[in-house]
C-alpha cells in the first residue's frame, strides 16, 4: 500500500488524493492546516481513546468476577452498591436543561420517521435523501398494507380493485388528518382556491372547506383549478396531486392522481453498523458519497423496468401560500451522519508509531471537513439551514466517553474554523452503562445533543455480554418481554424530557426490522409516537411514508407534555438481569433457538465477509425477511456464546448447527451469481470461519462487539483476492 507522510501520519495514497483533490477544494481549508490538525488530534487524543477502552475491559472483568460469585442479582441494593463502588453507576448531578442552539426544525420541532441507510451505497443514499416525500398510493399498493383478498391481488399489471382499496384508505386518512367542515374527502368533486381559502366542491354541488382553515398550507398551479394542494397536520405536509390526464386521475371523481406525504423527515447516512468498510479503499467510497450529498452532486445511473435514468438529489418544492407568498418546502430529508464509535482502528492512516489510528477520530475529521461544503463560510446551506452538522455517535459507554466525543468535536471545529458547537451530537443509548448514567451522558453533551435514541438491538447484545457470567439468558424472542427492556425504553423518554430535550432534540425509538410486513408495522409502530418518541427508525422509504401516518394520528408534543409529570422508570428494573430462572427448555426448543440464531448469523456474515455488504435482508427460520446489521449479529452471536458457556449447548452442537444452516443459507442465496457457497468447504470458507469465531470466541470479544472479527476476516479475504 502506497502511503503519503504528513506531520507524522502515514496516509494511504488513495485517501490522501481524495482529501486533497476532491474533499478540500471549496472548503477554504488547505492541506497543511488539515493534516497538521489531524496529526495533533490523533497524537493528543489517541492515548485517551485507548485508555477509555482499557477502562471498559477493567469494568467488565469486575462484573465477571461478581457474577461468578453471586450469579444473577437477587439483592438489588447490594448489586447497586457494587456498581457504584466500581464506578459503573455514577452519582447523578442536579437537574439541568440542555441548551443546544441552531437546530433545524426537522430535529427540534417536527415529529416524524427517520431512515438509516448505508452511505457506502450511492443508490440507497440518494433514495433515502429523496424520501422526504413519498407516494401514499404507491406505499399502500405495493405492500401488504392492503390485503390481497377479494380480488385485490398485486399481480403484474394495474389491478383496479386493489387501486380502489388504496384510494379508499387514502380518503379515510384525509378524513382523519384534515377533516372537511361538511362532507367527506370521498365526496369531493373539484377544488379551487378563493382568496386564502381552499374550496372543496362536493358531488352534490355543495361547497366545503377544511374544518380547520389553518390546515390549508398552499397550492400549485391555477387557483381556479390547482394541480397540487398542500395540507398540514402536526407540522407534517400532505400534497394532494390533481391530474386527470393520468389513468388514476382520470378514473377518480375528483381527478386526484396521488396523495404524497412528507415522510422521512431525517435520515442517518451511516458510516457504521450498516456498512463494511475495513480499509482506505472502502473509507474513500464512504467519504466520497458523503461528499456528493453535501455538495449536492451525487448521482447514480439506475435501470428500472428496462429504462435507464440518472438519480439525483431532489430540489425543494415551491408552492403558493394562502396569503399569496411563496411557500418553499424542503425536497430532501435532513441528513445526519453516523460516525463509528471509539472501538475500532483503521489501516487507512497510521500514526507516528506505525499504529492504526482510531477510526472515530478519522471519521470526525473527514466527515466534518466534507460538511463544510454545506455549513462552511461558502457553504450551500442546502442540508442544514441553521448551519449545523449532525453527527450520530454510537456505542459509547457512560458520560466519560460522551465527554471525550465532545472533546473530539471541539478540536475538529477549531481545526476547520467552525463555530463552537456547530457539530451536534446524537447519542445512541445502546450500551447498558450509558442507559444507567443517561442523565450524566446528556449533561456531558448539553450544548451539542440533538438526539437520544434507544437502540434496543445493540442494547440487548450489551445486556447479554455484560452479564455473561450470571447464567444462561432467556430465549432471544422472550427478551422483548423482559422487565429491563420496557424500563429502558421508558427511562430514555423520562430522562430526555427531564433534561429539556423537547424543542431542542429528538427522542428516538428503534428499527422496524421486517421491511415486507407493512400491515403489521401500521398496526404496531404507532406505539413509538404514543410513547413520546418524536422519531423512530424505519427500513425503507416506503416504510417511512406509512409510518408518517402515525404522526398525523398522534401529536407527539402533547404526549411529551403529558409524560413530563410521570414518575421516572425504575433503575432496579433496568438493572434486572434477563437470566432464565429455570432453564428447562426441551431439546427441540433449544435446537430451534440455535437454528434461528445460526441462520441469522450466517446469512449476514457471508455477505459481509465475501461481498462487503453491511446491511442485508436475511430470511429467518420462518422465512420472514429481517433487516440484519451488526447489532442483530451481536445479539445472536452473544446469545449462542452465552448458552455454550453455561452448558445449555455444546461446541459440537454449535458446529453441527452452523454447518447444517450453512446449506440452507446457500440455498437462499442460490440466485446470486456472486455468491460463494459455504457447505462442503467449511475449512476454506473465510465467511463460515468468521461466523464460528463470533460464537465460539464470543465471550472474549470486547463488549461482545462483532467488528474485530468481521474486519479481520474481510481483510483476510481481500488479501487473498488480491494475491
UniProtKB/Swiss-Prot annotation:
Residues reported to bind Mg(2+): 430, 458
Positions bound to glyoxylate: 338, 430, 455-458
Source domain of life: Bacteria
Pathway: Carbohydrate metabolism; glyoxylate cycle; (S)-malate from isocitrate: step 2/2
Pfam families hit by this protein: MS_C, MS_N, MS_TIM-barrel, MSG_insertion
A single GO BP: tricarboxylic acid cycle
Keyword Thylakoid on entry: no
Enzyme Commission number(s) from the entry: 2.3.3.9
Cofactor: Mg(2+)
Cysteine sulfenic acid (-SOH) found at: 615
Residues the record marks as active site: 338, 629
Transmembrane annotation, as ranges: none
SUPFAM superfamilies: Malate synthase G
Keywords assigned by UniProt, alphabetized: Cytoplasm, Glyoxylate bypass, Magnesium, Metal-binding, Oxidation, Transferase, Tricarboxylic acid cycle
Cellular component GO terms held in the UniProt record: cytosol
Molecular-function GO term, any one: magnesium ion binding
Subunit composition and interactions: Monomer.
Function: Involved in the glycolate utilization. Catalyzes the condensation and subsequent hydrolysis of acetyl-coenzyme A (acetyl-CoA) and glyoxylate to form malate and CoA.
Listed name of the protein: Malate synthase G
Gene: glcB
